[in-house]
């Protein structure tokens, strides 16, 4: 059984050939595809794909770190509204920190990451963590959750194997 833990097949680049992509995935042995949200502009498209492929595609809700900007509070409010009114989401993601492209909103990325971790605990959902060039900050944010029921997986992890081992000591996570 193969599980795709992270796919953005709802973006417009896949619109034309999405049925063929899904067919190829199923023929290749993929049993499930988990789809992390990016920001408020992608929620409807993501949910539409998941509804078109029930039992195969599963939605996640979250605010991607590269989408964190001066309007992050409004974006978080949208995420929280979906979390508090719908039980269709299987995880909170894609969340985390990305310092590869830009560090302008680092403080805000950290606040957004922390808030979404708290929601994961509140709603009993795993998290999908985007960690690009941000190990030290990710570790500082996650270390206080060492003895909590927080679970999740790391995506786009650019750290070393030693850093990955350190993160895995925090709790039930996969890199």
Spell out what each predicted region is.
Residues 1-172:
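Mid-domain alpha/beta scaffold segments of enzyme catalytic cores
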């Amino acid at each position: 059984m193969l599980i795709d833990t992270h796919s953005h097949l709802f973006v417009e680049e896949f619109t034309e050939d999405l049925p063929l992509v899904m067919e190829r995935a199923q023929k290749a042995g993929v049993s499930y595809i988990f789809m992390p949200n990016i920001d408020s502009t992608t929620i409807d498209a993501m949910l539409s794909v998941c509804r078109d492929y029930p039992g195969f595609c599963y939605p996640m809700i979250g605010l991607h770190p590269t989408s964190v900007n001066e309007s992050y509070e409004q974006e978080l409010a949208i995420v929280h509204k979906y979390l508090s009114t719908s039980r269709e989401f299987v995880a909170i993601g894609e969340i985390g920190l990305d310092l590869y492209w830009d560090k302008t909103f680092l403080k805000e990325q950290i606040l957004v990451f922390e808030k979404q971790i708290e929601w994961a605990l509140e709603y009993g959902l795993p998290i999908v963590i985007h960690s690009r060039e941000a190990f030290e900050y990710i570790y500082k944010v996650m270390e206080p959750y060492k003895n909590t029921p927080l679970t999740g997986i790391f995506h786009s992890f650019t750290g070393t194997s030693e850093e990955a081992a350190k993160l895995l000591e925090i709790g039930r996570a996969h890199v």
